[in-house]
Amino acid sequence: MITLRKLTDGDKGQFNKLIVSEAFDYEAFLNMGWCVNQIINQLNKNTNFSYGVFDNRSLVSFILGDLLNIEKISEYEILLIYVVKKYRNKGIARKLINKIEEKNSCLKKIYLEVAKNNHQAMLFYKKINFKKINIRKNYFCINGKKIDALQMAKTY
């Protein structure tokens, strides 16, 4: 049974399972500058607003981000979004972003950074109305190679 719910510190075991599973591209995860401890720290932040998708209690997808509220206006920064390969192209990432949108009636903008060579992700974001707003030169280091990041945003 597929369920979507807010992530908590209690889900750290699920992240450990996901990272050691064959479905998770651990090298890409590390190249993005993330580790399990950073995820746990994110889940404990006051600004954390993150969701996970579970299949029979196993984490198969997640969105990590910060919700920033400034005078009744909200902005959300997607820090990391991931879907296990076997669950891709099933609308799960879109459902996660929709959940962020529906839970925040004052939301004015969602923004993120994506590696310029991650064409699949860029197509996905464009399809759901994200627009390129900037380029950050040499932002990511993937397999020892510097990659530009596209900053993208969706405004409401």
Residue ranges and their predicted role:
Residues 115-119, 138-156:
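C-terminal "cap" of GNAT-fold acetyltransferases
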Residues 6-88, 94-99, 103, 155:
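Acetyl-CoA-dependent GNAT
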Residues 2-3:
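Extreme N-terminal starter segment of soluble prokaryotic enzymes
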Residues 126-136:
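Conserved acetyl-CoA-binding loop of GNAT-fold acetyltransferases
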Residues 84-98, 115-123, 127-128:
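Conserved glycine-rich acetyl-CoA-binding loop
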Residues 97, 104-114:
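Conserved GNAT acetyl-CoA-binding A-motif
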